[in-house]
Amino acid sequence: MCGITGWFNRQVQTADKPDTLQAMMSTIKHRGPDGQGKFFSQHVALGHVRLSIIDLNTGQQPMLSHDKTACISFNGEIYNYQELRRSLQAEGYPFNTHSDTEVIIALYQTMGIQGFSLLRGMYAFALWDKKTRSAYLVRDPSGIKPLFIAGDHQQLLFGSEAKAILAHPGYHSELDPNSLHSLMNFRYLPGNQSLFKGITQLEPGRILHWHAESGIKDIPFSTEANAGHNIIDAFEDSVHAHFTADVEVGCYLSGGIDSAAICAMGKNLSHEYQLQSFTLDAGDDPLEADNAQRSAAQLGIINHRQAIEFNPLQCLPEMLWHLEVPKINSLQIKLLAQVAAKKVKVCLSGLGGDEAFYGYNVHRFMHQANKLSKVLPGLTHRWAGAIGKQLLTHLSQLPFSETSRKFSIVQSLGQWSKVYGLMRNIWDNPKLRQKIYGPRMLDSDLTDCYQQLENLWPGNDDPVTALAQFENQHKLVNDLLWQEDRMSMACGLEVRVPFVDQPFLKTVHRFNRQQLMPHGRTKSLMKELFRPLLGDEIIQRPKSGFQVSSPHFFHQHLSVMAKQWLTPERITAYGLFNPEFVNKILQLKPAKKLRWHYFILYLMLLTHVWIEIFENKTDYKQFECAA
């Protein structure tokens, strides 16, 4: 795994700016502690920082083609590179290395951009073709690896992280209020947004073609992989592919099915070394770590269980600098990566299993809502409209109470994107904006988040399937994979996700939602198929996970930071939020019913830290956060 950055410029001046490229590379040096390199040629500057996983001795980048006419800066792993290499060698292509990077160049020189559809893996790369004066930015169809872009045909900048672009003298860091509004509602950035004005993401499965004369084209592509008929066979193939490395590979292990399945399959495939797994003992409930320990014992693998005491006052600013977006549940991801990075360079994660097999409560809730809408189509709306309005007048004066949210869900049955938004705590409406936001937000032209959701909502008649498709395209990519990439790379660890493998997903998608989740039972088919591999004890465990109760967490750990970052003076100075809302919540006793409100407070606090780091250019290491 690595980091890439650079630019394409119509003017031939790139060779005069090595210091600029070095500054951009320095911002992402944590992504590649094992080496770095630069390439300049006419209109192009390519930078690379390397974490060595495959071809440790000759895989340095940026990498030139054998004829010196093409150059690539690549972040990721190609799991089928050996198979592709053999095929290309048979056609006479001369290779100089044993790396997966050179295979990408060979595919391009042999097949053009059509060759990219043969790649199996996680990747984002920039490729320059001197012959045609064309450059390409490419991101994998699953969106596992990030790629940010800014600019236009005159000058297009890119980077594995937005901070690399911000290091270019042509850009300055400024918060995008509309993106912050999306973040406050979705708790991640859907679509191609970033939190910085003028910087966007290249969306998954896209090729951005830049040409010195003809301009920029955005080209969609997908992976050419045949769907199998057997999910277990496809899963075994995926895990086997994800063990491709010239270094030892470990596994994350929680108490659930997904990571246990990867460990069980990985143990069968790992013959040169004993498989190691890693578990974080933290959170509100130790049951998750206890279950992971039992899974490791049953599977016969080494488990490193690390008990960690939270000290957000020390690690939150650094975490935010890496994430570039305020996030609520990223601390445990970084702490687990730190544990694993002490032993291995690569870890496999069970991320994506719940998305593939309908494993979340929100899938079950949508199934129940769909059933209710068919049983009581007219009565439901009349009841919610008449009785609901009367009850709401007697509810808490706090905005967005749990009871009002449930009534809104019932009232909205049939409007499935809105129902989903309410289930996921999207709150956007004019009255709440006035309660929550300050003048800098209220004076901006903010997008209606429910309309944004409706515009992105898949056109599937089954609302549960539509929900799953939406979360695969947006929440998985821009929330879960985003956090996994940033927190692991901050620790010099590569994390791989077999459940997000394209050939595996194509096999799973041969089965419809009713087969994967019969009668609304989450992960039903997966449990049936994986029972022989894992046994009854693991399969029958209730779903748990690392949970942080936001009111308790905020009061226990963040109260000191709140005194520094959520003061009326600072809130007024930044102008983003309403100090009356903040003070009202801080004065209340922590309670479960305030969970939403404290999530909002947490995001507000981190947004203020974000402003100081990225807009005011304060080094996060200088923050005096300790009590």
Task: Name what the model sees in each region.
Residues 91-99, 170, 174-177, 458-471, ...:
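Structural motif
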Residues 8-16, 90, 131-156, 224-445, ...:
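ATP-dependent adenylate-handling active sites, centered on carboxylate activation for C-N bond formation
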Residues 434-470:
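Glycine/proline-rich, flexible active-site/cofactor-binding loop segments
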Residues 38, 99-103, 522-529, 541-551:
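Polar, surface-exposed loop/tail segments
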Residues 1-322, 326, 333, 337, ...:
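Cysteine-centered catalytic environments shared across enzyme families
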Residues 534-592:
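PAPS-dependent sulfotransferase catalytic core
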Residues 47-57, 141, 245, 471-486, ...:
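Short Ser/Thr-interspersed hydrophobic loop/turn segments at strand-loop and sheet-helix junctions
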Residues 84-92, 448-463, 509, 575-595:
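Short amphipathic alpha-helical segments and their helix-coil junctions
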